[in-house]
Amino acid sequence: MRPAGRSANQVRPVTLTRNYTKHAEGSVLVEFGDTKVLCTASIDEGVPRFLKGQGQGWITAEYGMLPRSTHTRNAREAAKGKQGGRTMEIQRLIARALRAAVDLKALGEFTITLDCDVLQADGGTRTASITGACVALADALNKLVAAGKLKTNPMKGMVAAVSVGIVNGEAICDLEYIEDSAAETDMNVVMTEDGRIIEVQGTAEGEPFTHEELLTLLALARGGIESIITTQKAALEN
């Protein structure tokens, strides 16, 4: 029995609250159960130097955790004077995932920065960040079109992510912290709304997993992501 009584393929309740903050072009509070992440999308005219003159835009991301988003306080990375390896890995993942959702040529020479700040962590913060940031990005792009700065919306479709893993020999979807910490295999999967894979991050923490188990985990992830994307689309319609 899972901690919340969920079935193996069931994601936690997902809530996406749009326009959560006042100033950002897109802002979303995303909740996967007790995991809560504030995602904002900020638009700047111009692109990084390596893209100047190429007529395309750029999407980048930053990720961070509030000191008491976890069970015990973690010092702010700013106080340490540098970002940790985990932070850099996650923010690069978020940026890669969201670039796959946008036609960068159609975006033109705009840069959109996605800031994902974890308010409360209970497993799956990177997958929640991708899911919420995608909705914030959609809102920001809609504002560019509404302002007449873009002729067409460059959004190609929704992108979402979910964690899957093997715990006590059972493949399960959307792991809470207590499950994640006990997982024999832990995997994060990012997909498009038509089921294409953007990224798979998978590690055997204990016993190596089989090819068949990998396929089972990917199928679980696809089902979970389909459910999450339905929630994303419903949020954007409200």
From Swiss-Prot:
One Pfam family linked to the record: RNase_PH
GO MF entries: 3'-5'-RNA exonuclease activity; tRNA binding; tRNA nucleotidyltransferase activity
Keywords (A to Z) from UniProt: Nucleotidyltransferase, RNA-binding, rRNA processing, Transferase, tRNA processing, tRNA-binding
Enzyme class: transferase
GO biological-process terms attached to the record: rRNA catabolic process; rRNA processing; tRNA processing
Catalytic activity: tRNA(n+1) + phosphate = tRNA(n) + a ribonucleoside 5'-diphosphate
Subunit note: Homohexameric ring arranged as a trimer of dimers.
Function: Phosphorolytic 3'-5' exoribonuclease that plays an important role in tRNA 3'-end maturation. Removes nucleotide residues following the 3'-CCA terminus of tRNAs; can also add nucleotides to the ends of RNA molecules by using nucleoside diphosphates as substrates, but this may not be physiologically important. Probably plays a role in initiation of 16S rRNA degradation (leading to ribosome degradation) during starvation.
PANTHER family, sorted: EXOSOME COMPLEX COMPONENT (PTHR11953), EXOSOME COMPLEX COMPONENT RRP41 (PTHR11953:SF0)
The family this protein is said to belong to: Belongs to the RNase PH family.
Protein name from the UniProt record: Ribonuclease PH
Organism, scientific name: Klebsiella pneumoniae subsp. pneumoniae (strain ATCC 700721 / MGH 78578)
